[in-house]
Swiss-Prot record:
Gene: aroA
Positions that bind phosphoenolpyruvate: K29, G103, R132, Q179, R359, R401
Gene3D superfamilies in the cross-refs: Enolpyruvate transferase domain (3.65.10.10)
Stretches that traverse the bilayer: none
Name of the protein in its database record: 3-phosphoshikimate 1-carboxyvinyltransferase
Pathway in which this enzyme or protein is active: Metabolic intermediate biosynthesis; chorismate biosynthesis; chorismate from D-erythrose 4-phosphate and phosphoenolpyruvate: step 6/7
Keyword Amino-acid biosynthesis: yes
UniProtKB keywords: Amino-acid biosynthesis, Aromatic amino acid biosynthesis, Cytoplasm, Transferase
Catalytic activity: 3-phosphoshikimate + phosphoenolpyruvate = 5-O-(1-carboxyvinyl)-3-phosphoshikimate + phosphate
Length: 441
C-alpha cells in the first residue's frame, strides 16, 4: 500500500524500554534497482538474491515488464530472475510507465529509454513524484541528443521520451548525484561514441561496479574517481547478483542502539561500500560504540556486520563534502543530534528539500512537536541537543525515512507518541515495525 493511498489508523509508539538482538535489514535499494535494470538489458538470465521486496524496486520491475522484460515475482526471501532482452530489445509500451513514488525509477528510466530510437515512452508517478525535479537528468541527456519533454520545461512529470540516436560526449554534472550519473551511463551504453561523465564530487558507485561486472567497457579515473568513461559496443551478459543489506536502513538501528539505554544490537550483512559509509564516519565523530565485524566481499561489494551499543554521544557537524555519502541518513542523524549535549550542525543538505518530501522542513517540524530546539536553514539545520523530548502526535508526511526516524525518537521520549501514515516505511523497509517489536526488551 502506498503511503499516499488510503489512510491507516495512527500507530501507537510506546516510549521506554531497551533494544537487544540481531537484525537483518532489507536488501540495498540502490543495488536492487540497478540489478533489475542491468539484467533487463543484458543477454541471458540474471538471478538476484536479496532484492528489496519493497514498493520502489517493484515500480522499476513493473516498468520493465511493461516493455517486454520477463521478471519473476518479487517476494520476501525469494530469488528473482530477469530474462534479459539485450541492449536494444525494450519494446514500446502500450501504457504509461508508472514509477510510483520512486525518483530513482524515473530518473534511471530517462537514461535507459532516451536512446531507444523510434520508440515513444511516457513516465508518470504519484503526487509526490510529480513534484520532484527531473531536469537535472533531462538537461545533460539533451546534450547527447535526447528528447525529454514535460511540465515546467521538462522538469516535472508526466514526462514524454521520444527515443533518439544518441551521441557520445563529455558531460559535467552540476551536482554529485548517483541517479544523474547512472542515467547518463545507461544512455552511454547505446550512444554513438565514447561518453565521459565528470562529477563535482564522488557519489555512490554501485552503477560503475555493477556495469563492469555485467561486461560494460567502463573506466573510472580522475581525482577521487570522478571521471567515468563508457565506450559502447560491449554486450552485457546476465549475472548472479547478491544484494547486501541497505546501510541506509541499518542507520535507524545504529542510531537507536547508540541512543537507547542498555541497547546492544548487531545488524548483519550490511553493505559497506565506501561511497555509502558516511553514517559510520559521523557516528565515530560522535564517539558511538560501534564495531565492524566479519568484513568480507560479496559479489564485488564490501559487506560486514555492525554491532552498536549504548553510550554518550558528542555533537557533530557535517557539510557538503560528506553529504553524497550520507544524504539519506540526515533525518535519523537529526534525531541523534537531539540527544547530544550541545549544538550539532547539518549544512550542504539542500538536496533534501526535493526528496519524497522536504525532509529538512518535515524533520524540523515533527521534532519540534516533541520539544526539540531546531533552527532550520536553507541548506540544513542547527540542533540544540540535550533537551528532553516528550511524546507527541506525529506524522510521517508520507516519507519512509521520516517515519522510521520518528519511531527512533519516540523510544527516547518522556511519554508515548502516535504516528500518522506509519505505513510509509514500506517504501524501503517493509518489515521495519515487525523488527522494532522483536528487538524491544
Amino acid at each position: 500500500m502506498s503511503a499516499n493511498g488510503p489512510s491507516h489508523p495512527a500507530r501507537e509508539l510506546k516510549a521506554g524500554g531497551s533494544l537487544s538482538g540481531h537484525v537483518k535489514v532489507p536488501g540495498d535499494k540502490s543495488i536492487s534497482h540497478r540489478s533489475l535494470l542491468f539484467g533487463a538489458i543484458a543477454e541471458g538470465t540474471t538471478t538476484i538474491d536479496g532484492l528489496l521486496p519493497a514498493e520502489d524496486p517493484i515500480s522499476t520491475a513493473a516498468c520493465l515488464r511493461a516493455m517486454g522484460v520477463l521478471i519473476s515475482p518479487i517476494e520476501a526471501a525469494g530469488l528473482v530472475t530477469v530474462e534479459g532482452v539485450g541492449l536494444d530489445g525494450l519494446q514500446e509500451p502500450a501504457e504509461i510507465l508508472d514509477c510510483g513514488n520512486s525518483g530513482t525509477t524515473m530518473r534511471l528510466m530517462l537514461g535507459l529509454l532516451a536512446g531507444r530510437a523510434g520508440r515513444h515512452f511516457v513516465l508518470d508517478g504519484d503526487a509526490s513524484l510529480r513534484r520532484r525535479p527531473m531536469r537535472r537528468v533531462g538537461q545533460p541527456l539533451a546534450s547527447m541528443g535526447a528528447d525529454v519533454r514535460g511540465r515546467d520545461g521538462g522538469n516535472l512529470a508526466p514526462l514524454a521520451v521520444q527515443g533518439q540516436s544518441l551521441r557520445g560526449t563529455v558531460i559535467g554534472t552540476p551536482v554529485a548525484s548517483a541517479q544523474v550519473k547512472s542515467a547518463l551511463l545507461l544512455a552511454a551504453l547505446t550512444a554513438d561514441g565514447t561518453t565521459t561523465v565528470i562529477e563535482p564530487a564522488q557519489s555512490r558507485d554501485h552503477s560503475e561496479r555493477m556495469l563492469r561486472a555485467f561486461g560494460a567497457d567502463l573506466q573510472v579515473g580522475g581525482e577521487m574517481g570522478r571521471h567515468i568513461t563508457v565506450r559502447p559496443g560491449n554486450t552485457l551478459k546476465g549475472q548472479q547478483v547478491v544484494v547486501p543489506g541497505d546501510i541506509s536502513s541499518a542507520a535507524f538501528w545504529l542510531v537507536a542502539g547508540a541512543l537507547v539505554p542498555g541497547a546492544d544490537l548487531t545488524i548483519e550483512n550490511v553493505g559497506l561500500n565506501p561511497t555509502r559509509t558516511g553514517i559510520l564516519e559521523v557516528l565515530e565523530q560522535m564517539n558511538a560504540q560501534i564495531e565492524v565485524l566479519n568484513r568480507r566481499d560479496v559479489a564485488g561489494e564490501p559487506v560486514g556486520d555492525l554491532r552498536i551499543t549504548h553510550g554518550p554521544l558528542q555533537p557533530f557537524s557535517i557539510g557538503e563534502e560528506i553529504m553524497p555519502r550520507l544524504v539519506d541518513e540526515v533525518p535519523i542523524l537529526s534525531v541523534a543530534a537531539c540527544f547530544c549535549d550541545g549544538e550539532s550542525r547539518i549544512s550542504g543538505a539542500s538536496e533534501l528539500r526535493v526528496k519524497e518530501t522536504d525532509r529538512l522542513a518535515v524533520m524540523a517540524r515533527q521534532l519540534k512537536a516533541m520539544g526539540a530546539e531546531i533552527e532550520e536553514h536553507e541548506d540544513g539545520m542547527t540542533i540544540h541537543g540535550g533537551r528532553p523530548l516528550k511524546g507527541a502526535a506525529l506524522d510521517s508526511e508520507t516519507d519512509h525515512r521520516v517515519a522510521m526516524s520518528l519511531a527512533v525518537a519516540s523510544l527516547l521520549a518522556s511519554g508515548d507518541s502516535t504516528l500518522q501514515r506509519s505505513d510509509a516505511a514500506a517504501v524501503s523497509y517493509p518489515s521495519f515495525w515487525d523488527d522494532l517489536d522483536r528487538l524491544r526488551c
